[in-house]
Amino acid sequence: MYTPFSGNAYDDATVRDCIDTIARHFGKMRPKHVIKDNGKIKNVPNDRLNYLLSSYPNPMMTASEFLEKFIAQYFTYNNAFIYIQWDEFTGSIKAVYPLDFPLLEILEDKTYNLYARFTFGAGERVTIPYENLIHIRRHFNRDEIFGDDNSKIMIEDLSS
């Protein structure tokens, strides 16, 4: 079970300013989906993921907003999750969403497939196959799946 640090570190002005500065600069970047074949970059015409990353990754946010939110979560919690929504008819990527949640449980079925059960702020629970997530972690040391949380060092630093 993973619970993001709830000690309100992001409510500290210095912490928020630092994370916001990094996130705003990252929001200016233009990431690209690259496919390599035999060591050479392959041209993929009409690449849906490149389109999403450069314009509107989902109906609710611009590319800059998406990147800023994702990076803010990454630096605040040392874990950031993006949900990949697939078009059920074409099999192509329809949208990508950064996920913000207070609780996450990792589940495993009898055939060792992993699932992430998210509980969102309003109490809604959703279970997603782990393979449909992009999970970026920082300080990936003590846990098999998650980056180490900041709670101990944040409590020490913010109470000093």
Which residue ranges define each predicted feature?
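Structured, contiguous alpha/beta core segments that scaffold functional sites
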Residues: 1-160
